[in-house]
Amino acid sequence: MTHEEILTLLGDYVDYLIANSSAEAPMWNIEKVRSGKPNKWNYIDGCMITACLSLYKTTGDEKYLSFSKDFIDFFVQEDGSIKTYDPKEYNLDNVNQGKNLFTLYDIFGDEKYRRAIDTIRSQLLTQPRTKEGNFWHKDIYPWQVWLDGTYMAQPFYMEYETRFNKMQGCIDSYKQFMNIKKHMRDEKTGLYYHGYDESRQMYWADPVTGCSPNFWLRAMGWFMVAMVDVLERMDEQLYNEYRGIMAQLRQTIEDVHKFQDEETGMFWQVMDHPGVEGNYLETSGTALFAYAVLKGVRLGYLPKRMAAWAEKAFYGTCDQYLSQNPDGSLQLGGICLVAGLGGKDHRDGSLAYYFSEPVVCNDAKGVGPLLLAYAEILAAQKQ
């Protein structure tokens, strides 16, 4: 397919997903579909609605906005409470969807969104932390920091503190990124480990470093996007902190790029083991790289030369995994459904573990990032 054909196909693909989804039954939330349980406030839908709102900002097409508003309004009540959301669960994943409330509040001015923003902020006020001050990923994972959590919570936290709290928590957010760099970055590759256990008690944690054993692509992807999204929400008056995260972003993109597959432009599920039996070129993490770089270039955080790396990743993913079914419907494949550490399934962070998780089509953990990158491609064409 030509690049133009891919972009046209993606426009049709979003229409297809929206037409077949609602807040009660989002077709892109494969975990929910498989569970058969009612939908609840979650980060997966949050990622998809963020993409829809980004497409609205880029194209001005009201269908993306009206769908997003209806979706969020299913959960957000007039008093600012959020159906199915419990702040005391202390799960950073649940903060992610909160980013979309800022956008809807700015567009519609409805105070229920402002109240709901405060509801989510209340979680972070008492979210348990490591001794060094990083949010625990979840209350059920004590003393643990996961890369995923930076994307889930830090952009919301930075925006709230910048807009509504006189920047009081902004340096706290910055310090959490610096702690992650200190503990989770591998000096040899420049890649970051998926998880870190400050207590060194978990079976997956290295007894010396506290880190999990491998570099999972999507975790790296969430982390790269987190830095871009935090910079976007950060006041440049925080001169040293702003430049500190920008330098961390640039170095990370340079280091990650070294692992880009030359032929396809994609990245491997476990990044530093290309071609190993069981490993595969994975959609979601590749799309997150493309989005982080394209947005970083547009906003001036990254040099323009990096855009070519992102475009190669974006179009390479579409060539590899975007296809039409015989009935004309579209699908995006190559998406790792889920990966974590610990828990009841004894997830040990080994290569065998990361290779064993299901690979699915049309899940928002891959679709959302690809559509965010698509919105950036469209925005770049307008400039």
Residue ranges and their predicted role:
Residues 76-83, 134-139, 199-213, 268-278, ...:
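Acidic/His metal-coordination segments adjacent to aromatic residues that form catalytic metal sites
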Residues 6-26, 66-83, 115-134, 167-196, ...:
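Long, well-ordered core segments of solenoidal/helical folds
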Residues 59, 108, 160-171, 230-243, ...:
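Inter-helical turn/loop segments and adjacent helix faces that build the functional surface
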Residues 51, 58, 100, 107, ...:
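Core register positions within helices of long alpha-helical scaffolds
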Residues 87, 92-154:
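Extracytoplasmic mature domains of secreted/periplasmic and thylakoid-lumen proteins
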Residues 224-274, 278:
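Oxyanion-binding "anion nests"
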Residues 145-152, 165, 169-172, 207-223, ...:
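Short, contiguous, pocket-lining structural segments
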Residues 2-44, 63-65, 74-92, 96-98, ...:
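CBM-like carbohydrate-recognition segments
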